[in-house]
Amino acid sequence: MNIILPGDKDYESRPSVQRKSLRINLNENIYGTFVEIGAGQEVARNFYRVGAASGTIAKSMSAYDKSFSDSIYGKEDNGRYVTQNRLDKMLDHEMDLLEKRISRDKNPDKFFFVYANTVATIDFAKKFKGHGWMGIKFQTNPNDEYSEIKLHLRFRQNEAKLQQESLGIMGVNLIYGAFYKHNEPLKLMKYLSDHLDDQSIEIDTINFSGPLFKGVDNRLISLELVRLGMTDAVIFDENGTNVLPAQVLYKKNILTLRGSYRPITKVNEEMFKKSLEAFLKEKKVKEENTIVVFEITLSNLRSTGDIDDSDY
């Protein structure tokens, strides 16, 4: 029985990394694979260390060598390994293997998951701090289709060891959140930083998909990233899918139009047309390599008081 003293205030208790890992390990129905490339096996290590992992972890693997990794997941057209496309291949390939090797007839109550990350930690010269993709493909009922959470992160720490440890903690937070906070995606996202210093990892892109997240608007998720200070800016496309800023803007001619756009008016449309016409007249600007970004700042959203999600 808990003791409550006069003057105690209600507060939200967040489990430690160890308790999160152990709770998952002790659930005899949660079963899956860990595949980690680029920063050790820090996420899986947390589950091994607390014990009772044999009924949870089907396999943990790190295909570090590029040739070996290519033989498993296939070559990337652009030759890059820390990409969302690589993450997608890892999640899909490992889930296919899990379903082929573990009989549903013998394990009717198991719900499967695959956790994957592909990262590059800080380089030897400490000029590039590193970044990565991590994600989880999972179900909370054996008969359900799989849901997914995928995110892009940037390391802010200056030591590879610290980056590895932070990645391990965030990975546990993601897996725990997927199983136990999927009904509250905004809280799930907030809890990704549990037990991490504010300056350790930046999340600049995250997307929720699948049956567990049917009602989730990923644009609002991206708004929350900025509102919580987890990143400075986010980009989403015309379909409402969050996209990686560096991937979309790299080597592009960028025309930015700032406004509140609530609603989009004739004036906005005319400004867009005239601005684009003028921009394309610049000598080094080619239309096929030009991208137009409509920018909305938090100041715009707060212009009439608190932020109204419906404006976004």
Language model region names:
Residues 2-312:
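Nucleotidyltransferase catalytic core that binds NTPs
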